Amino acid sequence: TRERIRAIAKQHQFRINIPARRLSLQQSNTIAFVTHAYHKEFSVADLFGLEIMGGISSGLSENGYDMLVVHVDPRETEWAHMYLDTGRVDGFILMTSTRKSDHIQALVEMEAPFIVWGPPKPGMKYCSVCGDNLSGGRLATEHLIQSGRRRIAFLGGPAEELEVQYRFDGYQQALQDAGRSLDSALIAHGDFTDTSGAVAMRTLLEQAPDLDAVFINSDLMAIEALKELRRHGRRVPEDVAVVSYDDLSIAAHSNPPLTTIRQNVPLAGKLLAQNLLQYLQTGVVTNTTMPVELIVRESA
């Protein structure tokens, strides 16, 4: 059986030679973009994924590949065998998160060709592309310090996510360099969704009503956080300055337009595609960190 063959291969520490495998199998010239089946309709909450998907599609098509969007149950891992063993796809592109760590572990163990958006998990070897989250956190916080803000809050994504931890480290370093100490009342977390931005902003206003700035870990969370600030009678940027993250297409069209850390999401998608195809050809694992930049608009 398939499981018995895998067990024997593992026992003898058999390693798949990716380029050789490509020669021995008929290739589908299709790459799977893996999303979670939390809901069936796309919405504004999917904007980051949609924009990175556009870059992936562009990078694949330039190299004669198609993209297949695969919705999977976040608790299941057998989907990878189904798509790879039947030759439907040649590899996978994933958006990393702690909810997907089982997926990454399973793909590493079956030695499937894949690449992940997000910082690589320590001790695991696989291809990845991520933004420079530490620099992003520093840039955002330094901008708020330089604009004269004293009580700068951090509104993060999930605290267990590596990219959020790196952004927090950048925030903390910038505060320390300015001779300021951390205040736990100025720290709250959402989950990168728009609605969580409003909830976390409300929490911050309750914990630290004197805050005069906030660094928010995504444009989506920032959009709803702006509305929450208005509901509390706070003007942006006069009363509270806001710097967000990603520079998605909506950032320039919010009210007010968001000052944000640009990750160049479409380029990230293109790099994910190109680096995975390079891995399929060479078997060489790459971990790419993309530079980020501060885009100044009207919110800070």
Label the model's feature ranges:
Residues 1-29:
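N-terminal helix-turn-helix DNA-binding module of bacterial transcription factors
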Residues 11-17, 72-77, 226:
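Short gly/ser/thr-rich secondary-structure transition/capping motifs
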Residues 202-300:
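Flexible loop/turn connectors
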Residues 38-50, 69-77, 129-139, 155-202, ...:
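Hinge/beta->alpha junction and helix N-cap segments in small-molecule ligand-binding domains
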Residues 151, 182-186, 236-242:
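Short acidic capping loops at alpha-helix termini that bridge into adjacent secondary structure
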Residues 26-142, 204-206, 210, 220:
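Alpha-helical recognition/docking segments in bacterial nutrient-uptake
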